[in-house]
């Protein structure tokens, strides 16, 4: 796993959750896009946990191009808020992208990490409902989540 998030508390929490998982052999950090690319060169099959909103990407296209460059990597977008347009563009571009929101329950985040470790796509309940509804609001989490996809 490569944790690409600029919030120290989020990194610490993610490290803690991942350290409790059975199949987590490698935990790395990246503080910017250059470090992320360097880590992906060394570990091209890694799962990247990315807070897109806090990272130095110029847009969804740049993230998709990076995925094309490192085709064997999987991505779990882990952010506070993502626009529906961004989510559609990225999630429909490749099955390698999944999404969980920072306000999801611990159980839903753990499910997302378990799916990611098995190279399975995960889309949290709120985002899947948002995409299915055709709404154009941002993916700001709701207080209650019912069912997860994995």
Indicate where each model-derived feature is located.
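Short, flexible helix-to-coil linker/hinge segments that flank and couple to helix-turn-helix
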Residues: 87-88, 92, 96-146
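Conserved phosphotransfer cores of two-component systems
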Residues: 41-43, 67-72
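Acidic, metal-coordinating helix/loop segments flanking the phosphotransfer/catalytic sites
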Residues: 31-47
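Conserved active-site segment of CheY-like receiver
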Residues: 6, 78-82, 103-104
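Conserved acidic segment of CheY-like receiver
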Residues: 1-10, 14-18
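Two-component signal transduction core modules
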Residues: 48, 75, 98-100
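Conserved phosphotransfer microenvironments
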Residues: 47-66, 79-86
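Short hydrophobic/Thr-rich beta-strand motif most characteristic of the beta2 strand and flanking loop
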Residues: 23-31
